[in-house]
Amino acid sequence: MWGSRAQQSGPDRGRTCLLAVLLLSFSLFQLHAQDYKPSQTPPPTSDALLKPMGRVQKEICGKTKFQGKIYGGSIAKAERWPWQASLIFRGRHICGAVLIDKNWVASAAHCFKRSLKPSDYRILLGYNELSNPSNYSRQMTLSKVIVHEDYNKLHSQEKDIVLIQLHLPVRYSSHIFPVCVPDQTTKEPSDESCWISGWGMVTDDKFLQAPFPLLDSEVFLMNDQECEAFFQTPQISITEYDAIKDDMICAGDITNQKSTCRGDSGGPLVCLLDSYWYLVGLASWSGACLEPIHSPSIFTRVSHFSDWIEKKKADTPDVDPSLAPLEETAPSLIGWRNYSAGTTLEPRICTTLLSSQVLLLQSIWLRIL
């Protein structure tokens, strides 16, 4: 993440710079300052039947210690995002992930390009700073890795989702708690802000520094047509180009330079719906993670996969606890190394033209005000 933002990468596509600039200038995101208020009690941990939106939930989900709206961004407060997970590959953070119930975690399929062997990975839960585990922090071993069978088959980054079954169920606390999973009837907010979080890079050439704090950012959802303008080529009209598929959703805040970056892949895009936090997206790809930010980030639209998620969970046998490895000590990450190319996909960006046009138009706009 850069400052108060998280940023990710994107596929090898061009874009129409002038149109992107015009959209940036005349479609500035409305900002919402939000207050948070710590509650007196941690989120409930007992099982219950809820119906926050659409499908009945088997467990309580989407509640945090922070009730009401949230202000600002940058370094996230402990317990703010208790579903945030880190995907570790051979001892190194490579991607974000999200706890969706006591046995399952979701992430981006492209995070598993290195290996599909569960024993190569670990899931970290209950962390705020990756180098400073707390008494709530847990390192979980993986039983199964289920990549969507149609990932990348027809289009780049399409169906970029993976389900991860844990060997042992997690114990819920105010630091470890699942987010709600939307179904296809869940309506995404059109006029409210959402949030992204992760331990990714600050920029493409700047690593997050120790103690590796979790960063978060307020972002806004963008309709597909507006988003398409940032990723089309000059030779193809907006009606012919189709970078944003039905299983993708756009979000960002270009005005305030908030996006996703390397190492944020698979992390959450969450929105507050009827007082519950929902996993609207999983970080998938975006433009280059450099200043100034030229384009929104693209996320896997989780509601598109709600039936797939339920089916895979139902079809997968529970792990026999007697056969599971012993729970491991939560580690303290002490080094930060380059991410493999698998965690980021960067499109070609007409940086010079776009940067100069943005600065010019923003200057004119400020003078008019």
Curated annotation (Swiss-Prot):
Any Pfam family hit: Trypsin
Functional note: May play an important role in the sperm/egg interaction; released during the acrosome reaction.
Signal peptide start and end residues: 1-33
Sequence ranges assigned to domain Peptidase S1 in this UniProt record: 70-314
PROSITE patterns: TRYPSIN_DOM, TRYPSIN_SER
Its EC number(s): 3.4.21.-
Active site: H110 (charge relay system), D160 (charge relay system), S265 (charge relay system)
PANTHER family: PROTEASE, SERINE 47, TRANSMEMBRANE PROTEASE SERINE
Record-linked InterPro entries: Peptidase_S1_PA (IPR009003), Peptidase_S1_PA_chymotrypsin (IPR043504), Peptidase_S1A (IPR001314), Trypsin_dom (IPR001254), TRYPSIN_SER (IPR033116)
Protein name: Serine protease 40
Membrane-crossing residue ranges in chain numbering: none
SMART domains, per database record: Tryp_SPc
Segments forming a coiled coil: none
